[in-house]
């Protein structure tokens, strides 16, 4: 009886250790829940890898959703892959592919909140994929073949994660910088790139800000009075 009891205790201890280890170890760790981070996470999970996405906000989709730039550029004759799945979900929601053509900048336009909802639905069905929202990477180390990341949670607690593979899904290259990868800011000169359209001298110019607005037709004039100090010429393109 004593041996049986000791055996049960040992089995419980091993099970507890294994479960604890699985909580802080993943095959693939993705920092950033933008469109690239989400799709990388979905594909990784579908290939059987235990995957974790760490995202600073409540949203998924990055530029396509939380930034409001919900207009997809590209070749619309390539409807396959994860983008194809995302587009089909949009078409199902809005009533067909033609319903996505609501602007002149893209053939795939949608409300940011709808895109966020669809990304969450696509993530939720993947059993090998977890998402930590309101979480921020605060420290990153590399020991032999393992990445060790310290993640600050919403309640300010720190969780340590071990991962075999690390993916930068921040859209700004934040993790690449943290890893010491060399980078440039701005536009390279034509002498660096051998491109005729490049400037003669390199500069620190970055892409201009994009103002995004979702418009609704109320069927009547609902124009508000001009605010004090408003000058429309300041917003002319």
Ranges and model annotations:
Residues 1-5:
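Positively charged n-region of N-terminal signal peptides that target proteins for export
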Residues 12-25:
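Bacterial Sec-dependent signal peptides at the C-terminal "C-region" and cleavage site
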Residues 23-34:
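Beta1/beta-strand and adjacent pyrophosphate-binding region of the FAD-binding site
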Residues 26, 155-165:
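Core beta-strand elements of the Rossmann-like FAD/NAD(P) dinucleotide-binding domain
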Residues 37:
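N-terminal Rossmann-fold NAD(P) dinucleotide-binding loop
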Residues 43, 49-50, 55-139, 143, ...:
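Conserved N-terminal/central alpha/beta ligand/cofactor-binding core
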Residues 161-171, 175:
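Short hydrophobic core segments
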Residues 177-237:
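Rossmann-like dinucleotide-binding core of oxidoreductases
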């Amino acid at each position: 009886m004593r041996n049986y009891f000791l055996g049960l205790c040992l089995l419980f201890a091993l099970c507890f250790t294994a479960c604890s280890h699985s909580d802080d170890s993943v095959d693939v760790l993705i920092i950033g829940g933008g469109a690239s981070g989400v799709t990388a996470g979905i594909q990784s999970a579908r290939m059987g890898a235990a995957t974790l996405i760490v995202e600073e906000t409540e949203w998924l989709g990055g530029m396509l959703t939380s930034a409001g730039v919900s207009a997809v550029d590209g070749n619309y004759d390539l409807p396959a892959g994860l983008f194809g799945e995302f587009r089909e979900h949009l078409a199902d929601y809005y009533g067909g592919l033609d319903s996505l053509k609501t602007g002149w900048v893209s053939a795939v336009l949608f409300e940011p909140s709808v895109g966020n909802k669809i990304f969450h639905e696509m993530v939720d069905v993947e059993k090998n994929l977890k998402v930590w929202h309101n979480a921020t990477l605060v420290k990153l180390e590399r020991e032999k073949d393992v990445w060790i990341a310290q993640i600050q949670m919403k309640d300010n607690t720190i969780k340590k994660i071990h991962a075999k593979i690390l993916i930068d899904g921040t859209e700004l290259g934040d993790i690449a910088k943290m890893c010491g990868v060399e980078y440039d800011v701005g536009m390279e000169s034509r002498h660096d790139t051998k491109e005729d359209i490049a400037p003669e001298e390199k500069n620190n110019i970055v892409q201009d800000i994009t103002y995004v607005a979702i418009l609704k037709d109320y069927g009547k004039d609902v124009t508000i009075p001009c605010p004090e100090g408003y000058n429309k010429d300041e917003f002319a393109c």
